[in-house]
C-alpha cells in the first residue's frame, strides 16, 4: 500500500477519519505497512482530529446546492467555505476537495452528493453539494432527502435549464419547502437586462413548482470571483448576502426528538483497525454511543451496537434528529451493509411490502408520462435513501391512471422496505419522474400477491 493509497482510504471515510479510541492501533498498523516518511504528518493530523468534540452551541440546519450541471454549484460551495474560513466559521474546501471522486474530476461534474460543514454567526450548517448531471439523478434524490432548504444555482449566461427544472421538481416532491436562489456567473454577462430576465424566469419557475416565487430571495453574483478574490461586489459581498438570506429565509425546522431513532443509511465505509461506519442524516430521535440498533431493508435484519458517533470529524456522545453523522457499528463488515438500509431502535418499526398511498401523477408538461398506465405498471420507488421496483395496483373501478391525476392506489414492492404512514416517496420510470406520493397506510400481503412473479 502506498502513502497515497492510505490517504485515499482515510479520505473515503469523511465522517469517521479519527476516532480517539483505538487510533494508536490504526496508526501503528499503517506505519508498519507504509514505512514512509510522509506518514508522521498524517498521524499528527489524525491525532488532532481525534480530540475534537462537536459542541452544539447553535441551531443545526441542513442545506444544499442544487441546479443544472456546470452552473457553479461546487464552485459556490467552495467559495462559501473560503469566505467563512476567514472568520473561523469553516475550513476552506477547495473545488477539488469537494469533487473528490476521480471520475468527477475527469469529467468536471459532481456525481455523488458531497458534504461540507460551516457556521455563520447564527447557525451551524451541514451543506450537501448535489450532483447536477442528468445521469446521476438517483444520487441527487439521495442527496436532497434530508435537506431543510436549498440554494438553487442558475448561471446568468444560461438561465434555467433542464436539470434546473428537474432539481426543483425533485426538491418539491421530497418536501424541501424553502429555496434561496444564487444567479451565478454574473461576471460573464455584460447586459444587466439579461440578468433581470433570468431572475424573472427563475421566479416564474419557482411559482410553477409551488414555491413563493415573488418572495424568494434572489442574489446575483459570481462564485468564481469570490473564490479568486476578484470584484468584491460580485464576489465576496454576493456570497455574504446569500448567507444572510439563508440564515433568515430558511427556518430552523422542528426536530422530532421524542420518537425512536431512525437513520437512513446513505453510505457504508470501512475504517482499518476500527470497523465499519454507516453514514446518513438522522431522520428523528436521539442516537447515543452504546445504543443497540437494527439495520433493516433489502432482505436484511441485522442487530448490532453503535460503538461511536462522529459528525464532520468531531466526536459525539449523542446525535439528534437532523445531524449528518457517521456511526461505527460493532462486528460488521462493509460487505454486510449497503446504502438504503435503515438503522432503527430494535422493535420500533418493521419493513413493509405493500402500502396504500395518495399519489400525484405528473403531467406531460411537468416532465411526467405522456400516456396513461394500467394496473401492474412497474416503476421504481425512491424513499429515504433506498430505491426499489414496485407494482401499482389501481382500484377495481379505475382502469387507467392519467397524467395530471391525483389518485389513491396500492403499491407492492419487490422486497419489504421501511415504509410507514406519512412517508414521502417519488416514482420514476427510466430517467423520468412520473409521480410523487405519501404513504397513507401499510397493508398485509394476500397469498396471491406473495406469489407475484417479478421476472
Curated annotation (Swiss-Prot):
Domain of life of the source: Eukaryota
Residues reported to bind GTP: 70, 72-75, 184, 187, 222-224
Modified residues (N6-succinyllysine): 91, 237, 289
Residue span of the annotated presequence: 1-46
In-chain residues carrying the UniProt-annotated modification N6-acetyllysine: 82, 91, 259, 364, 421
Chain ranges of the tr-type G domain: 58-254
Stretches for region G2: 108-112
Phosphothreonine PTM sites in chain numbering: 281
UniProt family annotation: Belongs to the TRAFAC class translation factor GTPase superfamily. Classic translation factor GTPase family. EF-Tu/EF-1A subfamily.
Disorder association: Combined oxidative phosphorylation deficiency 4: A mitochondrial disease resulting in neonatal lactic acidosis, rapidly progressive encephalopathy, severely decreased mitochondrial protein synthesis, and combined deficiency of mtDNA-related mitochondrial respiratory chain complexes.
Subunit annotation: Interacts with NLRX1. Interacts with ATG16L1. (Microbial infection) Interacts with human parainfluenza virus 3 matrix protein; this interaction inhibits RLR-mediated type I interferon production while promoting autophagy.
Protein name: Elongation factor Tu, mitochondrial
Lineage: Eukaryota, Metazoa, Chordata, Craniata, Vertebrata
Protein's gene: TUFM
